[in-house]
Amino acid sequence: MRRSTLALGWLAGYCAGCSALPAQDGTNVLLVVNRADKLSRRIADYYIPKRGIPLKNVCKLDILEEDEEIPWDKYVEEVERPIAHCLTKAGLREHVLYIVTTMGVPLKVSGPGEGIAAESCAVDSELALLYSKMKGKSFPRAGPVPNPFYRRKEQPFTHASFPIYLVTRLAGYDFDDVKGIIDRSLAARDQGKFVFDLKSDDDSEGNNWLRTAALALPKDRVVMDESVKVVTGEKDVIGYAGWGSNDPNRHQRNLGFQWLPGALVIEYVSTDGRTFRRPPAEWTIGTWKGVAGWFDGSPQTLTADYIHEGATGCSGHVYEPFLELNPRPDVLFPAYFHGRNLAESYYLSMPGLSWQNIVVGDPLCKLK
């Protein structure tokens, strides 16, 4: 295992243009609850007092279907329009910056098309466009929409500059997993190590993003491994990025890390956010060749496993995003380290919206 070296000029330069960030709180959050779902209601009841969410900031949907995937017409009728109505009725369109969905709110929208022209997307990523839609703008369903906030680290997040909502999800395998997210977000502290696990020492694009992330953080806080070995068993981890099941040498479902409160995760994996249903205990990751070993249509690692193991935030993908539209670790972790909250850190790192990305976590989580 090789620890990275730090170019101090890079670290100083990263924040050279950073503006003072205004403190955000529960009044800036719209919490979306499916009142037809017991788990969704229970999550809301726990989160509301923890973050001081005003009751007018709680948007109650009535979605009877239990499927994680819905078609476009149901998304518009049962999710997007009711949320827009909640924002308008409560006079919150401008003040709300973050939308938080919960278990019981559909996860993904099915649609025709393939590849970069696919009309399928994550519910949360489509909801990010709701602010602009409420202002009268329309967007094509096919393919990603450029994220105006991407890499704009020098500017505070405001609707005047960035006409979107930052949408995260409180989700896990069960209530205890989600309770853990909330509790750990409140206990987040600026300590621990950032672990970057390259799948080899080659100069692939994803590997270079990991190298750049390592150089943008204090060297005594970074572990970077460029060997073919998969990093496991690390302790005091506050950030992790790697290739997940796309690393040919990874065969175990869990990494066995000890995660600190506030720990964030990125993986370069196509379908890690495909479901929050719990796999059988004996299931583990595999290859695309062995269909019998797949879970929920894929053999790949799962976002929910990181949350279950103790991470506080994790990105994921409901369908194939393509590497260039993954969150960028070289943007996420420096932003988080330098004071951005969870939602802003992840969305700064994502090139596209109306796409396959989800962010699991409390948007207000911040290192202190």
Predicted regions: what is each one?
Residues 2-3, 51:
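Basic side chains
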Residues 3-21:
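Sec-dependent N-terminal signal peptides of Gram-negative exported proteins
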Residues 22-368:
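Cysteine-dependent hydrolase recognition
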